Structure formats: C-alpha cells, structure tokens
Amino acid sequence: MAFEALTGVNGDLVTISWMASKGANQTEHYLKEEVGGTVFFAFRASFSSEDLFATENTSPFGEIKMKRNQFPCMRSIGNDVDTTVNEAFLKSLEVLIGPRTSFHASVQSAVDRKQQVVFTGHSFGGATAILATVWYLETYFIRDAYAAPEPRCVTFGAPLVGDYIFKHALGRENWSRFFVNFVTRFDIVPRIMLARKTTIEQTLSYVLGKLDSTRAPIHESDQVITEFYTRVMRDTYTVASKAVCQLIGNGEAFLETLSSFYELSPYRPVGTFVFSTQKRLVVVNNSDAILQMLFYTCQSNDEQELSVIPFLSIRDHHGYEELVQSIGIKLLNHLDLHNPLLDGENSIGSALDDLGMSTRARQCIHAALEAEKQRVENQKKIETKRDQIVERLTWIVEVYKPKCQAHKNGYYDSFKDSNEENDFKANVKRVELAGIFDEVLGLVKKGQLPDGFEGSRGWINLATQYRRLIEPLDISNYHGQLKNEDTGPYMLHGRPSRYKYAQRGYEHDILKPTGMIAKDVFWSKVNGLNLGLQQDIQEILKNSGSECGSCFWAEVEELKGKPYEEVQVRFKTLEGLLEGWIKDGEVDEKEIFLEGSTFRKWWNTLPDSHKIHAPLYPRERMMDETRAT
C-alpha cells in the first residue's frame, strides 16, 4: 500500500509491465496485453545507434523541438518556448502512431471501452513508452478526462527523453504523476543522454551491443566499456554540477568557462524515479534531486567496487527482473521535502548510504530540495498579493469605469486625457498592478515557482481579468504620451511581456481541450472573413492588434488617422473579430460606442457605404437606442 501511495502503481501492475516489456522484444514495434480492465502497451527496445541519435540530426545531443500544433501542451507559457526531445525517440513514436502499425487503432479501442492504459518498456523501449504516454495525454486525456481514463507509464532503465521544459510542461498539466521510472543503481542507460554525442559516438555501437541481453556477456576487464562509462559520467558530472550551482546561485568559474565553449545536455528526468539497491527502494519525485542522484549513485568510496562499476553499469541494465520480484520485500524510502535526511535503518539517511551517497552528494540533494521549498515559498508570497490585485481591479470595474461612462467617453479616453482625480488614482493602481504581475512573470521565467503555478485556473482567470481591464489603460497611456510617434506602434515596441504572458496562459487554457493552438484558431477566423489570400493578409496584419481583444484600442489608434482605403483590410479584420471579443468578454461594448470614445469618433468618419453593410452597424444602432431610452 505504501509503495502504491508513493508511486501511483502497485506491485502487480509493475510485474505485468515488466513481463510485457520483455515480450515486446520479440515484436516489430509493440506488444498489447489485456489483464482485467487494463490494457498494457509494451515497446520493443532497439540497440541500434541510429535509434538513439537520428542519422541526419546534427545537434550535439540529437535533440529537436516538438511541433506545437502536434503537442500544444508541451511548451513553456512564460518563456513561449517549445519542448526539446530526442529526435530518434520522437521518430519511433511517429512510426508507431502512423499507418504502418495498429497501435493508434488499439489505443482508440481501449479508450472507447474506457479501459485504463499502461505504456511500458525496458531500456530504449521505455523512451517510446514515455512519448507514447504524452501522445495519449494530448490526443485523448486532455480533450475528455472523463472518457479517457488516467494512463500510467512504467519504465525500466529508460534513457532521458526531454529537456527542462518537457519536465515543466508535464508538471504544469499535473501529468508528472503518471510516470514511474525504475532505475537500478549503476545502470548506464538512464545516464547516456547526459553525454555529448561526440563524446561517445565511436564506442556507442559496441556498448549498445553489450546492453542487448540476447548477445554475448561482457567481461569485467572490458576496456571499451570502461572508457565509455568514464566519458558518460564525466559529462554527467558537468551537467549535475552546473545544475546545482544554478540552484544555489553560485556559478563556479571552471563550470562557467566550460559551458561557454561547449553545450551541456538539455535532458532532464521526469516523473517519479524508483532507485533500487540490494536492500531497498528509494522513491524520488524531485527532478533536480534525481539529476544529482544519476551522477552520485554511480560513485563509490570502495576502491574494489569502483574498479568494477563500468562492468556493473552494463550488468545492472539486465537486473530489472530481480528488482521487480523483490518489490514486496525491500525496504521503502521516500526522498522529499518532508523527509529529513535522518539516520536509522529505515531512514532516508540509511537509504542514501545504500546508494553510496557521499557528503557532497547529500549537500547537492539538499540544495535540490531547498530549491523546491523556495519555489513553494515564492508561490505563498505571491498568493498573499491576490487580495491586493482583486481590490484594485474591483475599483476599476465598480468605481472608475462607471464614472467615466457617465461622461460619455469611457475609461480608455478619460485615462488618456487624465483631467480628473480618478484618472490619477487609476494610474497609481495601474503601476502597482504592473509591479505585481512583472514580479510574477520574472519568477515564472526563472523557474522559481512550482511547475503547477502556470496551470492554476485561479491565476489564469485573475491574469485574464487584469489583462482585459488594465491593458487598455497601458495603451491609452502609450498613445496619450505620444510614444507611438517616438517609439513606434504599441504592438511592435510597446506591449509589456506581462500581457503577452497572460494572453498565452488564457489561450492555452481554453484551447487545450480542442488540441488547437491560438495562431491556427486566429487564422481560421480571419480566413473565414474572405478578405483575400492568407499570405497577403498575413503581411498586412503582421504588426496589427487583431490577435488579442485587449489590444483592440491599439489597433484603433493605428488605423484612425489613415485613409479608409489604406486600412480597409485591417479594419474589416478588426470588425470581423469584434463580435467574438465582445461575447468572450475581451472588449466592453459599452465603452466603444460611447459618443466621446475614440472608436466612435473614428467610426463616424467611415464611408456610409461601409457602415451600412458592416456587422457592427446593427449593434451601434441598438446601443444608441438603448441609451436614448
């Protein structure tokens, strides 16, 4: 029960996963097993160097960006960067879900029958299992969590698959809990992707052959294995050391110099890792701590043991049968924030002894746990400012906007003129809110908040309300101070990152159940207006404010002083999208048709031939009639 509580899987599920993983090696692509109401998909492990580093990939670690339109959740919202993964592993997934196999149809069948799905694999088959799980989450689970049961991914000695953003995205979506990775103490495969391709490529094929259990056994004195192990662990040390220096904010001069002339591996652990020794299992959820353990668990103070570790790094890759069989009898420890590194036979301190963790290793793990603790503390600090944000936004909605509307020019134009005391108060609140949201964005960009923060519905909603209410004031201030004349268009040179971040968070949240991305949705709407070829329209709209409703006023300011014929396409685009923005709450229709508003004044100058046929015409008439009564 304790094991299942910590990992999300029980011993029986692990045993079946292992048996299926072994059986998958006799297949071309995958093995499907049904046990009770659960369907197991196990993937074959390939020991070909081409399946570790894609042949045409010239990057130092065989990496490639995941395509956002295929994996829209696998990205950083704060930094607007897509996940990096190993290209060879990704290609294996693409073959798997393509027409050459029955895998896609088999998964669809399991989903239709509401069966739980487990993806599993040993060695490099585990890499496929990890990406197949991500594909399932993006294709089925995110779109209908009630119809698609929660998956599980169980791997044995799998290599690392993706970068920090891969780890972060899984954490943001609360998907990390679905991944459980078993690692024997010295197994080299979970460390291989931390080495540079140029470091290991000459001996890689030979070592992969030794990792294949169907081939001839290795000897303790095999010098090629020793050289390979040494090179992998040298690079692993550099990655782990640089990572811990970043955690404690203390860059060592040697590491700074080293990383300046060659890149370090981007790959990072994801999910839960279960490290195994002869006596116990150690469960770890902290990715930073796992990275440190991947290096330090392969060290030893015993001279005799140290000399045979290269041999053990291959032998342990073949030791998962024994691990699985002993799950029920081994001691169990959990390394986390709430488990101090104490002594005693069943303590985490004793577990670290079994893993050969030195004093330096424990300091590095402590730094990783402290960094996690600090991220939690940072979130608590941000949470204390929620009431301040709500109070300031409420004043804008309940006091400032109604008073401005009573003057028939709206809060956008009133703020631009800034003739009233309330305009000054609004500016103070605007500046205060900017400080809070800039602080939040700074923490997000630096990874100093828990991964789940970006996915918090409460903060997404609050940031959206902030963007919709306050960005028009920033635009008003920008144009009121004539910054557009000195600096250029607001959308090109003036829009603060805090609004872009809030926009991305909102769009991601509402679109992820559809599997679509904001850019594609926008162009689908624009193409529906039938204004011309998309290529031509893209050139016209490249610096426009039509991609976001809270930028409505920025687009109006850019268009209002130009001849109608010159901006006809941009205006029709704005006009065509406005109905949806009003419906979604992005634009307040009470504001735009007030007699003194910038938009209404510009609207009145447009040709009657356009206004009569415009989609806004009936709405304008209705608003006028409502005010008249």
UniProtKB/Swiss-Prot annotation:
Q: Which residues form the active site?
A: S123, D187, H317
Pfam families in the record: EDS1_EP (PF18117), Lipase_3 (PF01764)
Phenotype upon knockout is: No effect on RPS4-mediated resistance against avrRps4 bacteria, due to the redundancy with EDS1.
Specify the inducers.
Up-regulated by salicylic acid or upon turnip crinkle virus infection.
Give the record's GO biological process terms: lipid metabolic process; plant-type hypersensitive response; systemic acquired resistance, salicylic acid mediated signaling pathway
As for subcellular location, the record says: Nucleus; Cytoplasm
Q: Name one GO molecular function term.
A: hydrolase activity
Taken from the UniProt entry, a GO cellular component term is: EDS1 disease-resistance complex
PROSITE patterns listed in its UniProt record: LIPASE_SER (PS00120)
InterPro entries in the cross-refs? AB_hydrolase_fold, EDS1-like, EDS1_EP, Fungal_lipase-type
Which key words tag this protein in UniProt? Cytoplasm, Hydrolase, Nucleus, Plant defense
Give the matching PANTHER family. PROTEIN EDS1-RELATED (PTHR47090:SF2)
Entry function: Acts as a second functional copy of EDS1. Can mediate HRT-mediated resistance to turnip crinkle virus.
Q: How does it assemble?
A: Interacts (via N-terminus) with PAD4 and SAG101. Part of a nuclear complex made of EDS1, PAD4 and SAG101, that can be redirected to the cytoplasm in the presence of an extranuclear form of EDS1. Does not interact with itself or with EDS1.
One further remark on this entry is: Ecotypes cv. Landsberg erecta and cv. Di-17 express a probably non-functional truncated protein comprising of only the first 162 amino acids. This protein is not expressed in cv. Wassilewskija.
Q: Please report the name of this protein according to its UniProt entry.
A: Protein EDS1B
Organism of provenance:
Arabidopsis thaliana
